[in-house]
């Protein structure tokens, strides 16, 4: 059975559940698939989710967090001759770095919807951000995304977990939860191999 589109996965969820005697939950399949994808967004970080923003707009040591950002992967600063890592730390340490009067930035933290840098970027210093972005969910209006094309089993097993919870079927929930975790781990292993091989897919805004 093909599993590359929303309709494919929706059909598979219904078919798999029918095999265990659940023929009356088709109307809720959309919810199960959406909940599965929300869980994926929380638990998985894969190269196709990476986006590079070059030359962040920073005012008074602060930059707005991109609206689609899930998590920061890497921040670097550079001045035309050298580049260096900007490390994530606590707000206390960022504040202390700001008060130090040294050249920067060397550290950052996320606070109230902003990236705060310490010390504030020195004159002539630019900052690049690599972050993990949300991948648009598959739905009746969006038939495919990266997960449905390359890891559809993650969406399917996650949806079956949610459906099993809905049906109060603990045995099925445990079975599909194990399959979901195995599929997630396979993705993480694949990412690790790709990073060691130096083949990352980064999209530039």
Regions found by a protein language model. Name each.
Residues 1-205:
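Glycine-enriched, solvent-exposed interface loops adjoining structured elements
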């Amino acid at each position: 059975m093909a599993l590359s589109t929303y309709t494919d996965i929706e059909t598979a969820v219904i078919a798999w559940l029918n095999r265990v005697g659940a023929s009356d939950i088709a109307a809720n399949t959309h919810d199960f698939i959406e909940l599965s994808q929300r869980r994926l967004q929380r638990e998985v970080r894969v190269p196709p989710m990476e986006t590079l923003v070059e030359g962040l707009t920073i005012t008074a040591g602060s930059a707005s967090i991109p609206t689609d950002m899930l998590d920061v992967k890497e921040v670097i600063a550079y001045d035309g001759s050298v580049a260096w890592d900007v490390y994530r730390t606590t707000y206390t340490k960022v504040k202390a770095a700001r008060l130090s009067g040294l050249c920067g930035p060397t550290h950052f933290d996320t606070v109230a919807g902003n990236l705060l840098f310490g010390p504030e970027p020195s004159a002539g210093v630019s900052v690049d951000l690599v972050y993990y972005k949300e991948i648009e969910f598959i739905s009746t209006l969006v038939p495919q995304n990266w997960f449905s094309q390359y890891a559809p089993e993650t969406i399917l097993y996650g949806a079956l977990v949610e459906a099993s919870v809905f049906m109060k079927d603990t045995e099925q929930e445990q079975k599909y939860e194990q399959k979901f975790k195995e599929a997630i781990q396979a993705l993480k292993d694949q990412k690790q191999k790709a990073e060691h091989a130096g083949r990352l897919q980064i999209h530039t805004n």
